[in-house]
Regions:
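Helix-rich, typically C-terminal accessory recognition domains appended to large enzymatic cores
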Residues: 318-321
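Charged catalytic and DNA/RNA-contacting regions of genome-maintenance
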Residues: 1-289, 295, 301-312, 324-426
């Protein structure tokens, strides 16, 4: 297979069998073994996130589960210090690329990784060769002791393949990124290794033209180094990491998981662009002055599920058709139908807005494709199928989601199921 066995772990010469939780509890460096010829000390456990777990969006946890995978590569020889990074959140179909020159302390790399809070970091095997470990690898493993590390052969950090991936997967709306990154070889190399690896662990491929690809420079944001963020308790309480007494905890009245993620990112990497800040302040001012708009938006937005995570699972095509994959498709269609049915209420709430940003949001909701997708869904899914909370009620919704006469075998199975349920109820 593309990636080798990752179940062994050697620490100080003695073999250990570790579960995910025990591996992450160690203070030793945990490195995933990919196709390496050497028998270097390794420890590896990954968590594929193909399903969409839905919780109430009105109560977003301040400490969400990490779901970001990052690939990091550094130049060699005279290019040492030039770092390329590529990251993807398994709950969000967006690839973020970065390339920058860093100093010998690698403060920029550490800060960017702290902001991303990765589930897993992918690096080249040459960065951690026995007796020849790079300073970057040593610093990252020192700062991220509870993060899984995985190494892949250097040949998979291929900038040509990275550009091909971006051309193939980047949605047409974001195609201007090609011009930004075509000469940035290290972030392209990181993108190639990252996307190949994610496809491997997810056992799926991304649909063509389905990802948002963005090059993230640091020109319009302030950099807060990781030690300052920790000392100021911006997102994590130093006494108790589960305690919400932080700047993030005080400000987090967001109604969706996506909003919570955006707030966290803005706290750790605040904007310095005056125009953008003033545009946002205009929105705040309008919401303060128009009570009906404020509560109307709040009511609609709180009904949304994790839209970014839903999009992420929708654009992944499973390599194998299984019963579980089929069930996931039905579940995701119900979630998508629920989301699309909220477009009109959201438009109605935004209709009377005056600020440019809120008007832009309203105009984006005018896109006719929302209606076309919903119409296609309703040709197969019953109109009265609804997203409901609770496993049992959702199971019932899934059983009767597909309209009759679409598949005769499904109709027979469903009729049998109904008869059995009725018989049980009559006992």
């Amino acid at each position: 297979s593309y990636f080798g066995d990752k179940s062994s772990c050697i620490e100080n010469g003695s073999a250990l069998n570790l579960t995910s939780s025990s591996a992450r509890g160690l203070n030793s460096t945990c490195v995933g073994k990919t196709p390496l010829s050497s028998s270097r000390s390794v420890c590896r456990s990954h968590t594929p996130l193909m399903g969409l777990s839905v919780t109430s969006s009105s109560a977003v946890s301040a400490h969400s589960v990490a779901s970001v995978i990052v690939a990091v590569v550094e130049g060699r020889g005279l290019a040492r210090g030039e770092v390329g990074m590529a990251s993807i959140d398994l709950k969000n179909p967006e690839v973020i690329l970065s390339q920058f020159a860093d100093n010998t302390t690698y403060a920029k790399v550490i800060t960017k990784l702290k902001i991303l809070t990765p589930l897993e970091i992918v690096m080249s095997n040459t960065a951690c060769d026995a007796g020849n470990t790079t300073k970057l690898f040593s610093l990252i493993t020192e700062h991220f002791k509870n993060v899984t590390f995985t190494t892949v052969q250097r040949k998979y950090f291929n900038e040509t393949k990275g550009l091909e991936y971006i051309e193939q997967l980047c949605a047409s709306e974001f195609s201007t990124v090609f011009m930004e990154v075509q000469s940035k070889y290290y972030c392209l190399a990181a993108a190639a290794a990252l996307l190949k690896y994610v496809e491997f662990i997810q056992n799926s491929v991304y649909a063509p033209k389905s990802l948002k690809v963005r090059f993230q420079g640091s020109e319009k944001t302030a950099m807060i180094d990781s030690s300052s963020a920790q000392n100021l308790e911006l997102v994590i309480n130093n006494r108790d990491s589960r305690n919400g007494h932080t700047l993030f905890g005080v400000l987090n009245y967001t109604k969706t998981p996506g909003g919570s993620r955006r707030l966290r990112s803005n706290i750790l990497e605040p904007l310095v662009d005056a125009e953008t800040i003033n545009t946002r302040l205009d929105c705040v001012q309008e919401l303060l002055q128009d009570e009906e708009l404020f509560f109307g938006l709040q009511a609609v937005i709180s009904k949304f599920l994790d839209t970014e995570q839903l999009l992420s699972v929708l654009v992944q095509i499973p390599k194998q058709d299984t019963v579980k994959a089929a069930e996931s498709k039905i579940t995701n269609l119900i979630y998508l139908k629920h989301t699309l049915e909220l477009v009109e209420p959201l438009k109605a709430a935004l209709r009377s807005c005056n600020t440019s940003l809120l008007k832009a949001y309203y105009n984006s909701l005018e896109d006719t494709r929302f209606g076309i997708i919903l119409e296609k869904i309703t040709t197969v899914i019953n109109d009265d199928t609804r997203y409901t909370k609770g496993c049992l009620s959702m199971r019932t919704q899934k059983c009767y989601a597909v309209k009759p006469n679409i598949n005769e075998f499904l109709d027979i199975a469903r009729r049998t199921y109904t008869e059995i349920v009725d018989d049980i109820a009559g006992i």
